[in-house]
A protein has these predicted regions:
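Mixed-charge interfacial surface used for oligomerization/domain docking
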Residues: 2-3, 11-29, 33-34, 87-90, ...
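N-terminal glycine-rich anion-binding loop in soluble enzyme alpha/beta folds
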Residues: 4-62, 67
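Short glycine-aspartate micro-motif
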Residues: 5-7, 78-80, 258
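Structured helix-beta-strand junction loops
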Residues: 54, 74-75, 81, 152, ...
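N-terminal glycine-rich phosphate/adenylate-binding segment common to multiple enzyme folds
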Residues: 65-101
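A glycine-rich beta-strand to alpha-helix segment
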Residues: 82, 111-112
């Protein structure tokens, strides 16, 4: 069986994967004077510190068509995963690269998944595809399994800071400032359309945890694989892991620091939570 490659932009927070041919395609975070490429060399903590003190506009930039073509390689079938198309042009670039590659080699098959999400939910989709590949499934079978699984996966998030969202124009600076002054944490989800949908506002870690857990139940979580990414908030992530294991015995829960792109959006203290129903 020919090797099947998995390619994903860096919103998945993965750099390598055991037992599969995996390529990460970096996004970039930019200020007026500095650029942070979301690859293995990025010092995420230094980036977060710099951005917290940045007063001017900041923004993220997606991989271009050539970046995706390079990630797809010159031969073989590819499964590609991108951050939601509602936040980035990464999916459009990947689709354009797919078209070029398949025109150059009509025997190739490149399947691009607009995940309508980011971070831990994408990680779950990639883990699912890798598991299917390791079990010997065909390219078509893996694509079908991923599509079916995507219908059941979800992303929740809790933000302590919305500075970067304000700096790149996604929310008003007044709203971000008020949230910071009042100690409000915004809890939301990736909607079915792949947009950021706010679910509620909380004060304090305990109320934030309770809202996240109640939303997991509402969305049909019964355990299984659960992934928690955090930006400088390992203590809260650990507490959340512990409570999830208590409420969902047998759940396979992992927490980890977010990489560059997700740390840009989640910011200092932010949490991203991926699971399936």
């Amino acid at each position: 069986m020919d090797q099947i490659r998995i390619a994903a932009d860096s919103s998945c927070d993965l750099l390598t994967m055991d037992g599969v041919d995996f390529v990460s395609v970096p996004l970039t975070v930019r200020t007026a004077v500095e650029e942070f490429r979301d690859d293995a060399a990025l010092d995420v903590d230094a980036m977060v510190t710099t951005l917290r003190g940045t007063k001017g506009r900041t923004f993220s930039a997606c991989p271009n068509i050539a970046d995706w073509e390079s990630a797809f390689g010159e031969s073989g079938d590819v499964l590609a995963f991108t951050i939601t198309s509602s936040l980035s042009g990464s999916c459009s670039a990947a689709l354009a690269a797919k078209k070029r590659c398949e025109e150059q080699n009509p025997s190739r098959r490149i399947f691009v998944v607009d995940t309508l999400s980011a971070g831990p939910e994408i990680a779950l989709l990639i883990e699912k595809s890798a598991a299917e590949l390791r079990s010997g499934k065909s390219f078509e079978e893996v694509c079908t399994a991923v599509q079916q699984y995507q219908r059941r996966t979800h992303l929740l998030f809790a933000l302590e800071s919305m500075h970067n969202l304000a700096q790149n124009g996604r929310i008003s600076k007044l709203a971000a400032t008020m949230a910071g002054v009042l100690g409000i944490r915004a809890v939301g989800q990736a909607s079915e359309e792949g947009t950021l949908e706010m679910l509620g506002k909380c004060r304090g870690a305990r109320k934030t945890q309770e809202l996240l857990l109640s939303e997991m139940v509402r969305l049909g979580c019964r355990g299984g694989s659960i992934r928690i990414g955090h930006c400088r908030n390992a203590a809260f992530a650990l507490e959340l892991c512990t409570e999830i294991r208590r409420r969902f015995p047998g759940a396979e829960v992992k927490s980890y620091p977010l990489r560059g792109l997700c740390s840009y959006y989640a910011e200092h203290g932010g949490i991203m939570l991926g699971f399936a129903s």
